[in-house]
Amino acid sequence: MNKSIAPAPVVAAGDVKFGNSLPLSVIAGPCQLESRAHALEVASALKEIATRLGIGLVYKTSFDKANRTSAASARGIGLDAALAIFAEIRDSVGLPVLTDVHEAEQCARAAEAVDILQIPAFLCRQTDLLLAAAATGRIVNVKKGQFLAPWDMGNVVAKITTAGNQKVLVTERGASFGYNTLVSDMRALPIMARTTGAPVIFDATHSVQQPGGKGTSSGGEREFVPVLARAAVAVGVAGVFIETHPDPDHAPSDGPNMVPLRDFEALLRTLMEFDALAKKRPGAGTI
């Protein structure tokens, strides 16, 4: 292991740059990788929106939802089937790709076809997983655990940089507040920026999730996604993470907190306006 080094203040996935003082970028896509056709449909629509608005966009989706509430819940198509789809989105659609990994053994294989490996919030302290993700040389996006203080993310990031990888993003996705409820403390955004030195992302859709709130699945309050997203962008962040779907009410996972694809562009336009205002003057909007 190397001596711990500082994470890079600007991280680039292809042409998409993440930096706390740079113009806003976005990570977006459906919760679950449902099929090749569905993935390409959504990715193509998001590519068109990003091009029209002039914003950097990374496509996200999950090949396996390993922490579903119920054993009967749909988990996804699996890594073997996903790799070719990830590569097609990168090469044919022209978007960088993010996916989450749950086991150290998945990291090297997933890294063959994606630009960003994401560490789920529940696994953010798993040292072997963090080291395996870091060893791929890909960008590592770590979601802060719902149980973790924002200042504790410094130790999490140090595990990655100690392995020699400076390409780290940290994501806020809410904190547990009693049962089946999360709250977003906007102080966490500048605290994580200060204690980690990494670009900070705000996950606007999982922050409105109600974990296990529907008995055998999680609930959500998608009407509050724009509210929290605007608040985070007004603070000044490197990017926002927004799950979106053509028909979220019939999605296999996280439907209650996903933004309908038809509403995505209007939301993004608003967030870009907030971001421009927050970062209008030199030094302003830098968390």
UniProtKB/Swiss-Prot annotation:
Entry's localization field: Cytoplasm
Gene3D superfamilies hit by this protein: Aldolase class I
GO molecular function: 3-deoxy-8-phosphooctulonate synthase activity
Keyword Signal applies: no
Reaction(s) catalysed by this chain's protein: D-arabinose 5-phosphate + phosphoenolpyruvate + H2O = 3-deoxy-alpha-D-manno-2-octulosonate-8-phosphate + phosphate
Cited NCBIfam families: KDO8P_synth, PRK05198.1
Enzyme class name: transferase
GO cellular component: cytoplasm
One of the protein's GO biological processes: keto-3-deoxy-D-manno-octulosonic acid biosynthetic process
Pathway connected to this protein: Carbohydrate biosynthesis; 3-deoxy-D-manno-octulosonate biosynthesis; 3-deoxy-D-manno-octulosonate from D-ribulose 5-phosphate: step 2/3; Bacterial outer membrane biogenesis; lipopolysaccharide biosynthesis
Lineage of origin: Bacteria, Pseudomonadati, Pseudomonadota, Alphaproteobacteria, Hyphomicrobiales
Family assignment from sequence similarity: Belongs to the KdsA family.
Organism: Rhodopseudomonas palustris (strain BisB5)
Record has Cytoplasm as a keyword: yes
Enzyme Commission (EC) number: 2.5.1.55
Name of the protein this chain belongs to: 2-dehydro-3-deoxyphosphooctonate aldolase
Alphabetically ordered keywords of this record: Cytoplasm, Lipopolysaccharide biosynthesis, Transferase
